Amino acid sequence: MTGRVCRGCGGTDIELDAARGDAVCTACGSVLEDNIIVSEVQFVESSGGGSSAVGQFVSLDGAGKTPTLGGGFHVNLGKESRAQTLQNGRRHIHHLGNQLQLNQHCLDTAFNFFKMAVSRHLTRGRKMAHVIAACLYLVCRTEGTPHMLLDLSDLLQVNVYVLGKTFLLLARELCINAPAIDPCLYIPRFAHLLEFGEKNHEVSMTALRLLQRMKRDWMHTGRRPSGLCGAALLVAARMHDFRRTVKEVISVVKVCESTLRKRLTEFEDTPTSQLTIDEFMKIDLEEECDPPSYTAGQRKLRMKQLEQVLSKKLEEVEGEISSYQDAIEIELENSRPKAKGGLASLAKDGSTEDTASSLCGEEDTEDEELEAAASHLNKDLYRELLGGAPGSSEAAGSPEWGGRPPALGSLLDPLPTAASLGISDSIRECISSQSSDPKDASGDGELDLSGIDDLEIDRYILNESEARVKAELWMRENAEYLREQREKEARIAKEKELGIYKEHKPKKSCKRREPIQASTAREAIEKMLEQKKISSKINYSVLRGLSSAGGGSPHREDAQPEHSASARKLSRRRTPASRSGADPVTSVGKRLRPLVSTQPAKKVATGEALLPSSPTLGAEPARPQAVLVESGPVSYHADEEADEEEPDEEDGEPCVSALQMMGSNDYGCDGDEDDGY
C-alpha cells in the first residue's frame, strides 16, 4: 500500500513489485508505472571486502568513461565530433591564455569566439592553433590588454602574417569591429624591459606624454603601435639622461631600425620637436599637424611642379643660347676673308657642303663649334699662302700674284710632325724623369712626409678624451663578445680545477708537396709509389722487376716444352676427315671437281702412329711427301707460317675422293656431325 492514487478508478490499493519495477492497481488492474528507475545512491561490496558506489558522475564538458552494461556488453556512447572539437579548443585556449597571463573572463570570451567560428565552419581548412590564437588576440583587442600578435607568434612559432590573416578573417566573418590599439598600453611593459630603475615611472610618464602628442599630430593612424612606443621611449630616455641605443630599443619593441628612425623623422617635422624639455613638459600646443602621409604627398606635388617650371625655364634658356649661337656663327662667316682662284673654289665647295649638311640636319652643336675653330685656324693659313709671309695681308692684292692660285707644291707641304711640334722632347723628358726616380714609382717602404703640415698630422692623433670615448664605443659594440670570452675563460678554469679539461692539440701545418718531376708516366708512377706506398704487404722491388721484364724475352719462349709447340701445330692443322651427311648422289652432282685430291703434308709428333691410307681410284703419281718428326725445338719457315692460316682456308667445303663420296671410308674416323643414321 502506498499513498498513490489510481488514475483510472481512483483507488489507493496499488501493488509495487520491485523485482519487475512496476506499479499495478489491484482494483482495476491498470499498470501505473513500468521500469521504475531508482535515483538513490547504491553501494556494492567488492570481492576484497571494500564497498564502492554504483554509477559515476559525468560533468557537462568533462570526458567521461564509456558506460558498460555487464561484462559482455560494451556500448559506445562517445561524444560527437563537434563536442570533441569544442573540448580540444577549450583546452588549447586555457593553455595559451595561462602563458599570456589572461584572466578567466578573457578565456571564456575567447572560447565563445571559438564556438562561433566552429558554428560558421571557419575552422575547416585551417589549423586549430591558428584559429585559437586569432580568438585570443581578438579578445586582447576588445578588452584592451597589453598583448601583441607577435607574442602569440612567438609562443606558437608561426609566421605573424599567417596569424594576422586568420584574425582578419574571423573579425570580418563574425562581424566584430576590433578597436585600434592604444600604444599607451605597451609603455609600462616596454619601460620595465628597458630597466630604467628608480626613474621607471618618470620615463614612462614622459613617454606617455610624447605618445599623446604624436596622436594629436596624426602619427598614430596607420602605424604599428610598437614603432611609436619605441620612438617615444628612446626620446624619453634621452630626456632623463639614460643612454639607450637604437639597437637596445628595437630588441625590446621588436621593430626594425628603419621603422624607428622613420618615426623619429616624422616627429622631428612637427613643431613640438622644436621645444625645449622644460617647454615641452609645461606647454601643450593647441595646433595640430597634418598627417605625415598628407605632408609627404604635398611635398611630392610641389617637387613635381618645380620640375615642370624648371623644365620650361630650361627650354627658354636653351632657345636663347641657340639664338646667340646662330648670331655668333653669322658673325664668324662675315669675318672670314674671301679666297681667290682655286682656294675660292675650294671654299665654295666647302660652303656648299656646309649648306647641304645644315639643310639635312646631320651636324650637331659640337660639329658647329669645331667648324668655327677651324675657320679661325684657316684664316691664318690663307693669309700665309696668299701673302707669302704671316701677317702680310696687303700682299694678297699685289699685282705680283695677278690672281694666280698658289702652286701645288706649296699646298702639298709635309704635315707637322712630333719633332717639329716639340712633342718628342717633352716625351723624352718625362721618360728620363721617371727613370731617374725609380723609388717614387716602386716605393721602398719609407713614408715621404715632405710637404705635409704638422697640424694636419696632429688631427689624426686622438687626445685623451677622444681616446676614452672611442674606447667606450668599442667596449659597447663588442660587449657581447667580451662577455662570451669571460664566460669561456671561467668555464675553462672550472674544468681545469675539476680535472676534466682537455687541451686542444695544435693543428699541424700542412706542407705543400713538391711536384713529381718525371719524363714518362711509368717513371712518375714509380716515384709516386716510393713517396706514398699503397700497401705494406707488397714487395715493391719484386714488383719493379716484374714490370721491367713484362715485355717478354727470347729465352722464356725457348724454355717452353717441346710437346706444347707440336700440339699447337697439330691442333691448327687437324681438320675433319670427312664431311658426309648428304646424299652421295647429290654430292656427286654438286661437285664437278677431280676425284683425286692431293692432301698437304702433315707433321706427326713423336710417339704418334701413322694410320695407313687406302689408295684412291685413278690416283696420279704424286711426289713423295716427307714426314717430319720433331725431336726438339723447331724453327718454322715462311712456308710453315703460311700453313698456319690453313684453318681459315679450310672453312669452306674440302675436296674428297671417290671412296669418300661413296661412303667406303675404311680407315677410322669420328662420326659425322650431320649423320642421319
From Swiss-Prot:
Q: Where are the sequence repeats?
A: 91-172, 185-269
Q: Where is this region: Disordered?
A: 340-368, 385-413, 501-521, 544-653
Lineage at the top is: Eukaryota, Metazoa, Chordata, Craniata, Vertebrata
InterPro entries hit by this protein: BRF1_TBP-bd_dom, Cyclin-like_dom, Cyclin-like_sf, TFIIB, TFIIB_cyclin, Znf_TFIIB
Cellular localization per UniProt: Nucleus
Q: Which disease is it linked to?
A: Cerebellofaciodental syndrome: An autosomal recessive disorder characterized by cerebellar hypoplasia, delayed development and intellectual disability, as well as facial dysmorphic features, short stature, microcephaly, and dental anomalies.
Which residue windows does the record flag with biased composition (Acidic residues)?
640-653
Residues binding Zn(2+) are: C6, C9, C25, C28
Q: Name the chain's protein.
A: Transcription factor IIIB 90 kDa subunit
